[in-house]
């Protein structure tokens, strides 16, 4: 994986950002792609959105040690642009293998892009967030991306409510 050259993103990366966390997690969190800080540190969600994600996990009764965190793309797109279809195709086998190996009970998709990718749908995160979905044998729980709340305070309440619901699902209260 570290030497991957399957798409042009390899030319601009500092390193691949494969994923981090508990390899036997009940919850696999899937974001979009690494940002600048993630590319430098080699770990997903280490910037401001990552700090907020830690707070959100606590609302659900979780910590980073309880979950596995990955992205659809393993390399940073230039200027944090949206991933291109050929980049997604190049990275798909890696996320598929992570999902197969971890075999989570829940996949939490963060944001529009990962939600559409995992659920293979055109329906966006605004309609799907906070609702339990299915993708094959996996329960999928779409949630707004934590970065969205950094730019739009209205999303903060939705994020916190959705993570509270995730905690209830995990405890069997819903």
PLM feature spans:
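A polyanion-binding, active-site-adjacent surface
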Residues: 1-174
């Amino acid at each position: 994986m570290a030497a991957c050259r399957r798409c042009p993103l390899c030319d601009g990366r500092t390193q691949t950002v494969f994923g981090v966390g508990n390899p036997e997690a009940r919850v696999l969190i899937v974001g979009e792609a690494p940002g600048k800080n993630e590319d430098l540190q080699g770990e997903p969600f280490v910037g401001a959105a990552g700090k907020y994600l830690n707070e959100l996990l606590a609302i659900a009764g979780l910590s980073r040690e309880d979950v596995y965190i990955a992205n659809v793309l393993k390399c940073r797109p230039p200027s944090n642009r949206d991933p291109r279809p050929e980049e997604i195709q190049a990275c798909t086998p890696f996320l598929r293998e992570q999902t197969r190996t971890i075999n989570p009970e829940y996949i939490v998709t963060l944001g529009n892009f990962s939600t559409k990718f995992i659920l293979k749908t055109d329906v966006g995160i605004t309609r799907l967030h906070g609702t339990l979905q299915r993708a094959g044998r996996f329960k999928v729980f779409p949630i707004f991306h934590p970065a969205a709340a950094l730019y739009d305070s209205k999303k903060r309440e939705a994020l916190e409510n959705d993570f509270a619901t995730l905690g209830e699902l995990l405890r069997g209260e819903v």
